[in-house]
């Protein structure tokens, strides 16, 4: 089996053309300098919930573990207080 050697120039071009190429993820909360995630900030929390109503995992969003735990707790509190729906069946 033959292997094709790519130099850096071709590698960069290949990554940009590849539809599966994703940009490097970063933690939004670290960049913004957030200390505590608030359960009342629904606009931020909605960004971390998928179409089906599930909490998006940190490996997909790039959120650090410290903030992912806070995010998880904040979403659960908002759901408990009926600020957010538990499932996608409840449209706003």
UniProtKB/Swiss-Prot annotation:
Domain of life: Bacteria
GO biological process, one term: translation
Keyword Ribonucleoprotein annotated: yes
Gene Ontology molecular function terms on file: small ribosomal subunit rRNA binding; structural constituent of ribosome
One Gene Ontology cellular component: cytosolic small ribosomal subunit
The keyword Transcription is annotated on this UniProt entry: no
Protein keywords: Ribonucleoprotein, Ribosomal protein, RNA-binding, rRNA-binding
Family membership: Belongs to the bacterial ribosomal protein bS18 family.
Subunit (UniProt): Part of the 30S ribosomal subunit. Forms a tight heterodimer with protein bS6.
Function (record text): Binds as a heterodimer with protein bS6 to the central domain of the 16S rRNA, where it helps stabilize the platform of the 30S subunit.
Name of the protein in question: Small ribosomal subunit protein bS18
